[in-house]
Amino acid sequence: MNAITSCLTAIWTSSIGKKLIVAVTGAFLVLFLAGHLVGNLVVFMGPEPFNAYAYFLHHMLHGAGIWLFRLVMIAALGLHILATLALTRENRAARKPYECQATIQASVSSRTMIVSGLTIAAFFVYHMLHFTVRSGAAAGYDTAERYLNFRLPGVEHGVHNAWQMVIDGFSVWYVSAFYIVAMLLLCSHLSHGVQSIFQTFGLRSKKASALIQLVSVAYSVFIFAGFVSIPIAILVFGFGR
């Protein structure tokens, strides 16, 4: 146990160790976003497919699967934030006065990584409260008749109407607006973050740099377009209403 503790302490106290933590957790979160987007886009297939998908997620491992994954997600996000803040503090402490001018050369995305990251973290908390915990203005999602007893083929009892919950949630303009702004910040964060992951893993070279930058930007735009298509379709074009 002491050996494990010593190893973990050595990783955390090392700049390289913290960079690896940021890269590994970042890669996990990047892959999660792709999977989460694919699942979210099922909403366009209608109530039955989306509610069947939601029912499957909430009944994996007899209901424990979704919560185990959420705990892993929270741990990954927490480590990602803590390691990034620690690295930022170390870099600022070690920076010489004349090096401050170098930030002018940096991209907007790289200079706003901390701000965009913390805003995204705040959005994550709000998103969980809204669609998972269903607290505050979303409390009715657990009690109103329209969200209860949706009938699925092969399921004896009625299930929660997650599709209707999404439609009603994004029908509120300020919820959709906050969601779109958060996705814009996420896109900015990803465009620099994905490149940093490649660099930390030693996969970025002069020859591959342009391609990695292109892939990072393309992935960020794909994620942004996919996620915001849902509130825009509902709020602007009246999908599902």
Locations of regions flagged by a protein language model:
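Membrane-embedded alpha-helical bundles that constitute the cytochrome b-like, heme-associated redox core
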Residues: 1-241
